[in-house]
């Protein structure tokens, strides 16, 4: 390049310098370099325009360092490198890369004092540039590595709604391995117990979250009663087996899969049969108690309601017999009093005939008239209580609708228990046939 080219390019470079770059050129580091330098070419105004004047170039021609550095004795390339000393600092300010590309190669500096100072400057200024790039690359690697688990969790988020987790596939083996200190035969019986109850009470094609909560709770309570040592894992075992059934159905496998050989044994089958029989007896006992309690509560409510109705009828229709009921000594020798005591449960039903008898003797409160009235009238109305007593036991022998429904539930429970025992017997028989 000619000197005119450097002259035409330098004003553009001078105009592109910002005030912040001027301050950097006036920094203590640059001032220190200006004091050590014998020439006045680097101590200009900082815009690089004065270094291209002929007077300045003539003043620096006597310095032997400049011919060594520039090679051709021209001052302009050295001035360009002097202006380029600010380029590493300008890189921190994120200047366009075109400016950085315009810097000449540093080995062009000679072995003079200015060349050494420029190398020291570039060496010092390049050190703060490398940590941002190295740390930036390290941060980017950290960001990429830390982003990987987040991407995995985001990818697995939709599978949580499926209600079919893949990590439960090997739950049967896990249950067998983590049973330290427990009877393995009882653990096998517990697993088969859960399988039987889930097959009997739950729909295996419906997700476990949509199953009736009362049925699941009933199975858990049954497991807690028969296998108290495994009550903490009952819910998880039910969930695992139900999901495995759903997966097998989705994969096109048979619903009624046989029990794996490593999960069953003759002793476990015996424990299972005993647990099923015990649970059946306890279920029947609970149903009988519920029926008994419901049957006891209902007659009490019916008696209270009937007594209220009869008392209301007596007080509204027959006002005088209310005072005659308080005269108990009058009926001491009469046979009617025995009918009240003999039919204590039917006393409320016999109140209207008694009111009819005492209504005839409301005018004569004396003992003779009452005895005569009682003796004369006792022959006529006596068939009435007997007729009522014979006609009343028919409704009492009938069952209420609630009792009938309770009995039907008991019958259904017996049939279900019988079917369950029948299936257990068939499975035991098949097991014997398989072993033989």
Curated annotation (Swiss-Prot):
Instruction: Identify this protein by name.
Output: Nucleolar protein 4-like
- Which Pfam family would be a valid example here? HTH_NOL4_2nd
Chain positions with Phosphoserine modification: 130, 295
Start-end of Low complexity biased regions? 41-61, 375-396
Q: Bias category Basic and acidic residues: which stretches? A: 170-184
Which organism was this protein described from?
Answer: Pongo abelii (Sumatran orangutan)
Asked if Phosphoprotein is a keyword of the record, the answer is yes
Residue span of region Disordered: 1-184, 351-400
Q: List the disulfide bonds.
A: none
Q: Which UniProt keywords apply?
A: Phosphoprotein
Question: Residue ranges under compositional bias (Acidic residues)?
Answer: 160-169
Q: Which InterPro entries match?
A: HTH_NOL4, NOL4/NOL4L
Q: Where is the composition biased (Polar residues)?
A: 351-366
